[in-house]
Amino acid sequence: MVDERIIKFIKRHHTLNLATVSAEGLPYCAACFYAYDNKRNRLIFTSDEATRHAQEMAKNPNVACAITLETRIVGKVQGVQICGKAERGDEEDKRQYIKRFPYAAVAPLTIWAIEPSFIKLTDNTLGFGKKLIWESKK
């Protein structure tokens, strides 16, 4: 079970920075709006199949992403780093995404979902450099 503090942080935000890697081993990142399904522990986002990151995910599903609170106050620094596998989303993922972003209902969507294997929350509000780590048992 993912720590409630991690879930709360993920649900409070809406943009993740996704990292993929090309067949040649070159990294790439893209910012994506996301919804989080805490029942299934999935980060859900859209990406056109023509984008570089979608093409890279189709060939190599291993991804990482970061969600951060932008602040200059050291005592308020918070962010998650996530590793996992990306896959094409299902109907439930689409419902969750549209629930979070209703305007997306009228757009042609290619839904993706990340199933995390590792999540690390750094939260300085709990103490300087305090980290909470969750790892999948799979």
Language-model segments: residues:
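Residue-level signature for short turns and capping positions that connect secondary-structure elements
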Residues: A23, A50, E70, I119, ...
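Short acidic (Asp/Glu) patches
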Residues: S47-T51, A64-L69, E92-A104
